[in-house]
Regions:
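Short, non-helical or kinked segments that cap or interrupt transmembrane helices
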Residues: 1-10, 68-81, 110-118
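Hydrophobic alpha-helical transmembrane segments
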Residues: 23, 52-57, 91-99, 116-117, ...
Length: 179
């Protein structure tokens, strides 16, 4: 939390601590989102989609604005990914969104851009795959897409003025190389 972007997320962990540490951070963030969205409503006896969306929303907000770290957390992407896995109706949209994130990362090198695009892709794909039915999940996925734009607003500004840091593709490719 004192190095790199000072953000508490997998991207900064990768840049400052390496791939294994970053993978650990990502797994914890995804599981945190999934656990709170899937199990908390079960434990309190209210397993409605609305209850799950409130639990998911709360876990994302808790990640981005943690009380114990003076309300300065990560950007919520890993945690949001975990919350989406708690909804079977979103599996395909989430997979397509994740693939769009990967493609954006590999083509442009911009993690934040990939995150924003993936949020919009999940929303768009879910709306069309649900025959444009508006329900609690539609609003939840809309919240996530808008929230990704808000939490990445500084990245967007830097992209527009040409000063955004690219994820070092060499680092990413070296991770997959055999040693």
């Amino acid at each position: 939390r004192t190095k790199g972007s000072k953000a508490a997320g997998a991207t900064n962990a990768f840049r400052t601590m390496g791939a294994i540490f970053a993978l650990s951070v990502l797994i914890i963030d995804v599981y945190k989102g999934y656990f709170s969205t899937f199990y908390i409503p079960y434990l309190i006896g209210n397993e409605t989609i609305f209850a799950k969306t409130i639990a998911g929303f709360s876990s994302i907000l808790g990640h981005v604005f943690p009380v114990y770290f003076k309300f300065k957390g990560g950007k919520g992407v890993g945690t949001a990914l975990g919350t989406l896995f708690a909804f079977p109706q979103l599996y395909l949209a989430t997979f397509i969104g994740f693939m769009s994130w990967l493609i954006t990362l590999f083509v442009t090198g911009y993690v934040g851009l990939g995150s924003v695009i993936s949020g919009v892709v999940v929303l768009t794909f879910y709306i069309f795959s649900s025959n444009c039915v508006i329900n609690d999940l539609t609003f939840y996925v809309l919240f996530i897409a808008i929230f990704f734009i808000i939490t990445h607003r500084e990245n967007i500004k830097r992209l527009l003025n040409g000063s955004e840091n690219q994820f070092q593709k060499i680092m990413l490719l070296n991770f997959f190389k055999k040693k």
